[in-house]
Regions:
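Solenoid-repeat scaffolds in large eukaryotic assemblies
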Residues: 225, 234-238, 299, 306, ...
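A cross-kingdom marker for long, charged
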Residues: 472-476, 486-540
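Ser/Thr-rich, Pro/Gly/Ala-heavy low-complexity intrinsically disordered linkers and tails
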Residues: 25-146
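Bacterial N-terminal signal peptides
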Residues: 13-27
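Extended ligand-binding clefts on enzyme/binding-domain cores
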Residues: 145-183, 189, 215-219, 270-276, ...
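N-terminal secretory signal peptides that target proteins for export/translocation
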Residues: 1-11
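Internal amphipathic alpha-helical repeat/solenoid segments
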Residues: 170-221, 229-270
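Substrate-binding cleft of extracellular glycoside hydrolase catalytic domains
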Residues: 234-238, 242-312
Length: 540
């Protein structure tokens, strides 16, 4: 081994381990590559591909997009599915900074595939966190994948990307901003439409399971869309989504939760607000004020609108000054713990100066309910698997509204799977020890299962629900489960490998197996958090 050989730490999601790839480039008669030339896939003698960091890996087709080319193999090697084998020391072509990993290009109406776990292609020095890249001369080097804060734009406070890591949390070893951009493009292409949007744009549900009208819009989707748009610096879409929301206000001045595809009004049973949607919109409006200031194309300033939303939330969706209602008119017998967003409420408490508002009391009360739901009767004291619906004592409420897609509200299902994300934010942003204690339970449970064996539904005791034990459903891995579980696991370095694995599955598109709208939404939101782009308002 020569002095110019380098040791590169590479994460391979299929193995779930860190590999040490030795780049003996000088011994093959080549100078080592520079950082600017190590983008997208330098072909060499060892290693697999992940996210464009390692050349010669396999390209994976994203749902709704076109397959990318993968990293180009070195001399004598072949790129493409399965991992092309490059000749020792060969230099691969790589991808451009605005392309998906491995040189796939974005196309209008879709996205190219991201490089998945590769075969024997060459290792690249791009995107490593612990190794400084060597030097090489190449005629036309591709630019490296973007990493680190984007310089401030005029009137924009935190343009994408930022990569502002929080010291309380761990992050995937090889995260890439290109992965987030690709996921966002795909979500936008598949779910955002002007059809039936009253002159603006909306988020549709093109193929969601269940009984809701096809292509309808749920207020939850508008909330998710506003969150994504503000962090991706997409002001035009943000404003359109909000203006669509304003066209569909219900009895309490809050958006009805399910709107017909043609925009003519709420669906049958779609009247009334949903608390999780309203709080996501409120937080997104606060972030819009921080991001852009002013009012954009809206009639009022973002901050003033957010304050109005906080008032609507407090007056209609808080019960007895301390319990989180699931919708206006509900009481403490029908609590959805996946609506509990303590990190938001701590921010609301700093901005909402209304004398009757006490967001701190809501935080404290709802943490008490969350902990009460983990008990010996439920069999979940050690795993953190909360029921979708419960009462204030933590007892599952099987008769609650919104059981969801045939899933019993007494199970850990498509509502409750979001809890580790919302609670994980409170640890990462605020150092809340109650949050840390909770996500320690879910992280230990899912880490013991492994990402590869996670399914889309569990009894509260941790047993996979019957329909997920055998057959095709036993292979289901949706991003709505994997993404939030991965975000929760960011709370402890013990679960670094689980975080890496979760990220690896999200970026391959393997987790897009359920409905397009819900899974793609949680893919983007989780990737934003995992790449340190889902920022804390108070830290900006």
């Amino acid at each position: 081994m020569t002095d110019s050989s380098r040791v590169l730490r590479i994460y391979t999601p299929t193995l779930g381990v860190l590999a040490l790839a030795v780049l003996g480039v000088a011994s093959c008669g080549l100078a080592p590559p520079t950082a600017s030339q190590a983008s997208g896939g330098q072909g060499g003698s060892a290693g697999g591909q992940i996210g464009g960091s390692v050349g010669g890996g396999s390209s994976v087709r994203q749902s709704g997009g076109s397959a990318g080319a993968g990293g180009q193999a070195g001399s004598g090697g072949n790129s493409g599915s399965g991992g092309g084998s490059g000749a020792a020391g060969g230099v691969g072509g790589g991808g451009t900074a605005n392309s998906l990993s491995g040189g796939g290009t974005q196309a209008s109406g879709g996205v190219s595939g991201r490089g998945g776990a590769g075969g024997s292609g060459g290792a690249s020095t791009a995107e490593t966190r612990d190794a400084s890249p060597p030097d090489v001369t190449v005629d036309t080097p591709p630019p490296p994948p973007s990493r680190g804060p984007t310089p401030s734009q005029t009137g924009v406070k935190f343009p994408f990307p930022q990569n502002r890591e929080n010291s309380r949390c761990v992050y995937p070893y090889l995260y890439r901003n290109e992965d987030v951009q690709a996921a966002y493009n795909q979500w936008k292409n598949d779910t955002v439409t002007s059809d039936g949007a009253n002159g603006f744009r909306r988020v549709k549900r093109p193929n969601e399971p269940g009984t809701l009208e096809s292509n309808s819009t749920v207020s939850e989707g508008i909330g998710y869309g506003m969150l994504m748009a503000v962090y991706m610096n997409d002001q035009s879409l943000f404003d359109d989504l909000w203006q669509y929301e304003q066209k569909h206000l219900g009895q309490y001045g809050l958006m009805d939760w399910n709107i017909k595809a043609d925009g003519s009004g709420p669906t049958s049973g779609g009247s009334g607000a949903a608390t999780d949607a309203d709080e996501d919109m409120t937080f997104a409006l606060l972030m819009a004020d921080k991001q852009w200031g002013g009012k954009g194309s809206l009639g009022k300033n973002y901050l003033d609108i957010a304050k109005g939303m906080m008032s609507g939330l407090w007056n209609n969706e808080i019960y007895n000054y301390k319990y989180l209602r699931s919708w206006p008119g509900a009481d403490s017998s029908t609590i959805n713990l996946s609506y509990f967003a303590p990190a938001y409420y701590k921010l609301f408490a700093k901005i909402d100066t209304t004398p009757t508002s006490n967001w701190t009391a809501v935080v404290d009360t709802m943490y008490t309910v969350l902990n009460a739901s983990l008990n010996s009767s439920n069999g979940n004291t050690g795993n953190g698997l909360v029921p979708a619906w419960c009462d204030s004592s933590g007892k599952p409420n099987g008769g609650a509204f919104g059981a969801g897609s045939g899933a019993s509200p007494t199970n850990y299902q498509y509502d409750s799977c979001r809890v580790p994300f919302r609670i994980g934010l409170d640890w990462c942003w605020n150092g809340e020890t109650r949050a840390q204690s909770y996500v320690a339970l879910t992280s230990k449970f899912f880490n013991g299962i492994t990402v590869a064996k996670m399914v889309d539904g569990y009894d509260l005791n941790g047993t996979p629900r019957a329909q997920y034990q055998t057959g095709d459903k036993a292979q289901i891995q949706s991003s709505a489960f994997i993404g939030p579980a991965g975000v929760g696991a960011m709370s402890n370095a013990t679960y670094q490998s689980f975080v890496n694995d979760a990220y690896g599955v999200l970026i391959t598109g393997k987790a897009l197996v359920g409905g397009t709208y819900y899974d793609e939404s949680w893919m983007v939101l989780s990737l934003l958090m995992m790449t340190a782009n889902f920022l804390d308002y108070t830290a900006i």
